[in-house]
Every structure is written in C-alpha cells, then in structure tokens.
C-alpha cells in the first residue's frame, strides 16, 4: 500500500512567526560566515526544523530581506564578489567555457542550467568552489543563421527546432511554425532567426538524441527574421556565409543615394590644388580577375637612382567623414572576397568607377613621390594630391612574360616596356635591400578554385607568384614606409601596421620541431633573431612543411596607434597607405 502524501499549503498562504524567521536567518548566517560561500536553497530547506511548505516560505522570505537568490537555486550574500566573463563556443554543450574578463583566472565550465550562446557576457559570482555564472550582462549576437532540424514527420506541429550553421554553437532555437513563411523550404533553405529578448538565463535543457549524443542541449525561444539562401548552392552558400559572419551585402538606402549624387567622371572643380600628372605614363598591374584598381605606378631613372611615384586612389575626396558612405565603409572595414565574387566596401560607382584607376580616364589620387638611391634607400619623399591618367591596365602574367622577352607579353604591354624595365631595375635594388635588412620572406603557395558556368567548383590550381607581383609589392612597401614616417614626423595619430617578435615559448617549440629534421639554430637575443630566422626560411624553401612551422612561430600583425615596428619586414615603422578602396584602416 502506497504512502499517501500530505497536502502542503501554497507558499503565499503560509503564516510565518518571528521566531521561525529569526531561526532561518541564524542558520543562513552560519552558512555564510565566508562571504564567498553560496548556500543551496534545497539544502537550506532540509535544515529547517519545520514542514517543507514552511521551509520554502522561509527561503522566499530570506530572499526578500537581503540575501540574494541570484542563480535560482542558490543563496548569495549581497556583498559577494562579482566579475564578468565571455562565453566561448564549442562543438558540444559540455565543452562550452567562460573566460573571465575582469579577474585573473582560467576558463571554466558552465553550470548545466545556464542558458547561454557563444559571445554572451555573463555576470560571475565567486563561491567557495570558484566563480559561477549568475546572470546575463549582454548578448552581442542574438541573430543566428540556422537550418531546420525538426523531423519531416513532425513539421505539422506548432513549434519548429533549428540548429545554427556554425559548428561551435551547440544550441537550438525554437520558432512558432506560423512565423515561417510558406515559401521557405525547410529541407533546403538556411534562415536567420533572432533569440527572444526575454529568453531566460536559467532553464532546463532538453536531450537532443538526434544529434547522436546523450548530452542535453539548450533551447532558446526565437523569432523568424528572413530566408538567407539555399544550402549547397554556390550563390546561396555565399549569402549564407555573409550572414553567418556578419558581412553586409546590401548598402543602406542613404549610402546608395549619396553615391548616386556623385558625378559620373572627374569634374574640373576637383582639379583645384592638384598636381597634373596626366602626362606621366602611370600603369596599373593586377591579376586577370581584378575589377578595382586602387594603385598605379610610374618610375624614371635619376643620376642617383630612381624616382618612384605611387598613385593611390583618393577615396577621401568622395567619402567624407560622417557621411553615410563613410559609416557603411567603417562598418564593413574591408571588401570581402569569395572565390568567384566580392562584397565591396564601397558602392560599385566608387569601387569600380570614380575611385578605380581605370585606363584612359582621369582619376583623383594621393601620390607618394619618392627618391630611391642605388642601395635601395629612400632618400626623400613627399605626398601631394594629384590627377593622373592611367596609360595601361596590365596584368602580372603579361608583365612577367614581357620582362622575359616573350612575344605574347611584348605585344600585350606594347609601348610600356620601357617603364616596366625601369621598374624592374628598381625592384632589383629594393629586393637586395630587403635581404640586407634580413626581412622575412616566406615562399608560400596560394591555391585558387576553378569554376564552371553555374558556379560549381570543378578544380583547383596554384596561383603563379612571379617577379611582376614582387615589383608591385616592393613599390607599395616604399609608399607605406614613407606614410608611416610622415605621420611620425608630423606627430599625427595614425594606425600603424605592427608585428612583434616571436614569443620565446614558440621559438623553443620551433627548435624542437627542427631538431627532429637535424636542423639547429642559436639565438643571442633580439639582435640576431631576424638574421637567424631569415636564414632558416632560405634554407627550408624546398620544405613547405618546415616553412609552415616557422610561419606559425610568428605573431600576427595587427593595426594599433602605438608603433612597435614591423618585425617581419624589419621596418622601424610601417603603415598601410595603399588599398583604400578595399581596406578602411
């Protein structure tokens, strides 16, 4: 015979005596002598010498009188230390971690009841066993690109479940089926969903057996935003990737309106206070598939060496600070290149029109006019606004073919051969100076995809990297170094392109790797670090796997206002003056 359960009064109907409240406070105070201690409510209920309904009422009363129940199941002292942390994504819910922001500490796992997504900033409370999530501070990413995972047989139900495309977001989003438009193909389409603003921070997870795992997954209430694209379709995948990584494809109406008001060609008023260089035979040298041309070069020989002019598209003439064009460009930061298409930083009227140094038309530029001696040293430079007229849209393939004396290349470059030979001679001394200062020069291969007419990938090939590429690279280095020196001389705040020395731990790892191949090196401190690494790179050019190991030893280059030099290029100061059409910094 089963035991009959006694009926309990609702908590709101329980009458508490002052003695019971005092006794409960005494018990809790004893548990919280250490301000960092967190008492479990269920344990507190068990410790009360009274009926469970009374004990639950006492716990509620304590919450109202100063002791916080911040984590639903816990009591914390109101003065308990707090901090913040950021949730890191993972493939499985149990692998998600929190990285503390405002306190020292390593990553730690989340509590099973915390409902979080990667990127969430959470409040942390310190307990006797360490920091624990206590609440949501902010959720920077509410929108997720998802695919439907509800079984086909169950799609007639009221709710649909979706899983983010990202492999590092082990969550599920639940949407009312009536919110999803009928034209959305739940089998093939990726959609964008937004997590509800009132989604609870603490909630019970559900087991998602169809993931092939016995783990419990977090479910968030969400709303349908839009259809993104068809999965496994070339154009659809580009749209999906853009949405997944926050790449805006469409420009705002205000930006398009501002672009539309710009002239179709350079007008006479724009030429005021500009140097007229239209008589100089500037050329652009780019890849065959390039569509925007933001730099042009011209070189002439001098008694001491060469005069190099690098003309960069003057985007700032058309994109003024504070305009919608400027705000959209800031938001995008760069153009984003897909294998067969590009999402531009600027509207096409600018990126492929007014700001592109197309052949046969006048274009506004900012010119770096530099003198280089026969040791490859820049002895003088100046910057000024100018107007140029490109005399040729050349490709790396054609230029290299011409410089090798091949008939096809010579016919393609035509009368520009003289300028190209001068550029090549200048490149020779710049390349020698590069070796002299022990700049690091990795020989890496770049692969490119081959596409069918319908956008499907049909193969891959290795991009050729020849001296025509290197001519332009060295010319851009000259201009960028001059830009950095100019900013320093004028005491102007700017973003430098900086690259720090490798960390000692990574150098030690590299020593161990190379030792396995019978290669050793000795360091005497920072003074011989670059020469040693440069020689290692030279000695392993025929061993790509070792080149990769050396490359992974390097720190990542970044932009910052504090100049620390560029270790890889061995420059005391370096900035990016070039590529303004596709790069905002």
Predicted regions and their residues:
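Electropositive polyanion-binding surfaces
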Residues: 9-12, 198, 207-213, 230, ...
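Charge-lined substrate channels and their catalytic hotspots, especially those that engage the 3′ end
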Residues: 2-309, 316-361, 393, 398-401
């Amino acid at each position: 015979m089963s035991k009959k359960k006694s009926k309990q009064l609702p908590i709101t109907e329980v009458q508490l005596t002052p003695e019971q409240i005092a006794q409960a406070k005494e018990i809790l105070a004893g548990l919280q002598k250490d301000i960092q201690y967190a008492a479990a409510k269920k344990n507190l209920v068990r410790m009360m010498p009274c009926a469970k309904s009374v004990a639950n009422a006492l716990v509620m009363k304590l919450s109202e009188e100063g002791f916080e129940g911040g984590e639903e199941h816990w009591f914390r002292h109101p003065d308990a230390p707090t901090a913040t942390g950021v949730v890191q994504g993972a493939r499985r819910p149990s692998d998600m971690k929190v990285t503390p922001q405002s306190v020292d500490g390593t990553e730690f796992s989340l509590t099973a009841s915390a409902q979080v997504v990667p990127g969430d900033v959470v409040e942390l409370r310190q307990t006797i066993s360490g920091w624990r999530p206590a609440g949501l501070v902010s959720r920077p990413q509410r929108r997720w690109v998802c695919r439907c995972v509800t079984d086909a047989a169950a799609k007639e139900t009221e709710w649909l479940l979706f899983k983010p495309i990202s492999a590092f977001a082990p969550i599920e989003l639940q949407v009312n089926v009536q919110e999803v438009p009928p034209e959305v193909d739940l089998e093939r389409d990726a959609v964008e969903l937004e997590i509800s603003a009132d989604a609870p921070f603490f909630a019970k997870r559900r087991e998602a057996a169809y993931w092939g795992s016995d783990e419990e997954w977090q479910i968030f209430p969400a709303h349908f935003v839009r259809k993104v694209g068809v999965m496994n379709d070339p154009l659809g995948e580009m749209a999906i990737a853009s949405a997944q990584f926050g790449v805006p494809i469409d420009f705002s109406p205000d930006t398009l309106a501002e672009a539309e008001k710009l002239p179709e060609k350079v007008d006479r008023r724009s030429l005021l206070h500009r140097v007229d260089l239209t008589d100089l035979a500037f050329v652009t040298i780019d890849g065959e598939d390039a569509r925007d041309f933001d730099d042009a070069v011209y070189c002439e020989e001098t008694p001491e060496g060469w005069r190099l002019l690098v003309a960069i598209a003057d985007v700032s003439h058309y994109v003024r600070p504070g305009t919608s064009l400027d705000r959209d460009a800031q938001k995008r930061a760069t153009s984003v290149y897909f294998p067969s298409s590009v999402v531009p930083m600027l509207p096409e009227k600018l990126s492929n029109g007014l700001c592109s140094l197309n052949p046969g038309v006048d274009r506004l530029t900012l010119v770096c006019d530099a003198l280089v001696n026969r040791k490859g040293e820049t002895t003088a430079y100046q910057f000024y606004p100018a107007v140029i007229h490109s005399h040729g849209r050349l490709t790396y393939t054609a230029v290299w073919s011409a410089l090798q004396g091949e008939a096809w290349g010579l016919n393609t470059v035509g009368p520009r051969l003289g300028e190209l030979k001068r550029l090549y001679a200048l490149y020779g001394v710049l390349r020698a100076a590069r070796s002299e200062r022990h700049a690091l020069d990795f020989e890496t291969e770049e692969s490119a995809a081959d596409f069918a007419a319908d956008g499907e990938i049909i193969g891959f090939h290795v991009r050729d990297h020849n001296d025509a590429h290197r001519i332009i690279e060295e010319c851009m280095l000259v201009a960028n170094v001059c830009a950095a020196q100019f900013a320093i001389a004028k005491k102007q705040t700017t973003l430098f392109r900086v690259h720090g020395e490798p960390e000692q731990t990574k150098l030690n790892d590299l020593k161990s790797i190379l030792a396995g191949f019978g290669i050793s090196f000795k360091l005497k401190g920072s003074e011989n670090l670059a020469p040693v690494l440069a020689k290692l790179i030279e000695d392993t050019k025929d061993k790509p796997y070792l080149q990769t190991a050396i490359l992974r030893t390097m720190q990542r280059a970044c932009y910052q206002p504090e100049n620390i030099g560029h270790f890889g290029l061995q420059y005391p100061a370096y900035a990016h003056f070039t590529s303004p059409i596709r790069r905002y910094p």
